Amino acid sequence: MSSEGELGIEVVYALPGQQTVLRVELPAGSTAGDALNASGVLERHPEIDLTRQSVGVFGQIVGLDTPLHNGDRVEVYRPLQVDPKEARKRRAARKAS
């Protein structure tokens, strides 16, 4: 549990077959970037490239400078493997045949 003036934050990164959930305590006023750095997720998963990957809080994409609130979950999103528009076309073509 967080003491007053501290934020209890979860940092999450998911791979196929593996999910990393790290809990950190940060001072009030900390940002999404602070949480990523404090959690060690970037060292644990060196494949994370924040110049290509988005970060979010509870499914909403945010910047690394976004202030956090107690109980927030910071998520690192992997790049899409297939364009969603192309995937819909493929499914429609399979269904039609």
From Swiss-Prot:
Signal peptide: none
Record-linked InterPro entries: Mopterin_synth/thiamin_S_b, RnfH, RnfH_sf
One family name in Pfam for this protein: Ub-RnfH
Entries under HAMAP family matching the protein: UPF0125_RnfH (MF_00460)
Family membership noted in the UniProt record: Belongs to the UPF0125 (RnfH) family.
Protein name: Protein RnfH
Gene name of the encoded protein: rnfH
